[in-house]
């Protein structure tokens, strides 16, 4: 679920939260029932990297980090993605040379730079397609709440700045499913960043008795940033985090423009942004996800002063990805053995 998160989601007291509470209760009831269903099983190890809430948490760079380590360990990882924002139907294997963000979504194109990616609303069918391509490890990008594919391990990502928001379920708050239900199905949590909300998240996770891991996002840019003044624009789930990353690289953010998550920029949008930047002698700045969507428009020569920002994940526990992948494989082998034993007895 990718939408522009309203501000009241991140405030503890709000009239809108109270007003939307009855709808939230109904949504929460049915979402809990969805999570209780039995998902189809594939004979490959499956690691789900998801989140508790609607909106951006830094999940995509985490999936990329796991794909990189998986390849280092000798696996052929395949990523199952919903393909948010894309128009393709059925099961589609992403080809980064020929597909555009309008076809498969911006996240799928970013992920395809590091692993095989299959996009589909049917996650089981997508996993089967990846198996045919020779993949021997499935990384599921999101899909924790939908339960459309059996998961050997579930890692949920939390943005420390936002935490669980106001603690309410959609649409009164950002939670996709009531926290208690999500806690019961998850295996561990990855908390990214620093903030006051981090302490509340840590407290709630500690009460579940399940592991809490920590990481930080390290910004990088396509050109030198320090000392430059920027007009920054983004159509992502959490644009404030992007604006902060410019400052962390010693850039000066003078103007900011935000658009809905997964927004496809028009020529008119870009012309307006370029003119405003030129008027105040500013550099343009955007994210790697936004730039992939901008590339669906024919090449523009007036974007030469555009700097693209991306992020890498810096895990506090340096061998975190390796250790978690080993746990995924251990669980997969255990269920495979149990299935073989049960079949033999039958």
From Swiss-Prot:
GO cellular component: plasma membrane
Keywords linked to the UniProt accession: ATP-binding, Kinase, Lipid A biosynthesis, Lipid biosynthesis, Lipid metabolism, Nucleotide-binding, Transferase
Domain of life: Bacteria
Binding site for ATP: 53-60
Bilayer-crossing regions: none
Functional pathway: Glycolipid biosynthesis; lipid IV(A) biosynthesis; lipid IV(A) from (3R)-3-hydroxytetradecanoyl-[acyl-carrier-protein] and UDP-N-acetyl-alpha-D-glucosamine: step 6/6
GO MF: ATP binding; tetraacyldisaccharide 4'-kinase activity
Function: Transfers the gamma-phosphate of ATP to the 4'-position of a tetraacyldisaccharide 1-phosphate intermediate (termed DS-1-P) to form tetraacyldisaccharide 1,4'-bis-phosphate (lipid IVA).
Stated name of the protein: Tetraacyldisaccharide 4'-kinase
Organism: Bartonella tribocorum (strain CIP 105476 / IBS 506)
Gene: lpxK
């Amino acid at each position: 679920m990718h939408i522009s998160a309203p501000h009241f989601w991140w405030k503890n007291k709000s009239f809108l939260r109270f007003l939307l509470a009855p709808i939230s209760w109904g949504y929460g009831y049915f979402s809990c029932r969805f999570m209780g269903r039995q998902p189809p099983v594939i004979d490959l190890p499956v690691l789900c990297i998801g989140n508790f809430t609607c909106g951006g948490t830094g999940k995509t760079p985490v999936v990329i980090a796991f794909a990189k380590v998986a390849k280092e360990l000798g696996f052929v990882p395949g990523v199952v993605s919903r393909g948010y924002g894309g128009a393709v139907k059925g099961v589609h294997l992403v080809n980064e040379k020929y597909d555009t963000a309008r076809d498969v979504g911006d996240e799928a194109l970013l992920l395809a730079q590091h692993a095989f990616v299959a996009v589909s609303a049917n996650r089981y069918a997508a996993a089967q397609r990846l198996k045919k391509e020779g993949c021997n490890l499935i990384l599921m990008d999101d899909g924790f709440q939908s339960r459309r594919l059996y998961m050997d391990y579930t890692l949920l990502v939390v943005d420390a700045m936002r935490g669980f928001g106001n603690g309410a379920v959609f649409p009164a708050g950002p939670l996709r499913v009531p926290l208690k239900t999500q806690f019961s199905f998850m295996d561990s949590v990855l908390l990214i960043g620093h903030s006051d909300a981090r302490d509340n998240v840590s407290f709630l996770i500690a009460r579940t008795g399940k592991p809490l891991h920590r990481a930080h996002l390290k910004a990088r840019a396509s050109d030198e940033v320090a000392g430059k003044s920027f007009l920054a624009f983004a159509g992502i789930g959490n644009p404030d985090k992007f604006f902060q990353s410019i400052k962390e690289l010693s850039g000066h953010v003078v103007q900011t423009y935000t658009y809905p998550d997964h927004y496809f920029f028009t020529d008119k949008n870009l012309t307006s942004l370029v003119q405003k930047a030129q008027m105040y002698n500013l550099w343009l700045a955007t994210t790697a996800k936004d730039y992939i969507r901008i590339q669906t428009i024919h090449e523009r020569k007036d974007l030469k002063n555009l700097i693209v920002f991306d992020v890498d994940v810096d895990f506090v526990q340096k061998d975190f990805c390796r250790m978690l992948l080993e746990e995924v494989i251990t669980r997969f082998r255990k269920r495979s053995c149990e299935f073989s034993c049960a079949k033999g007895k039958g």
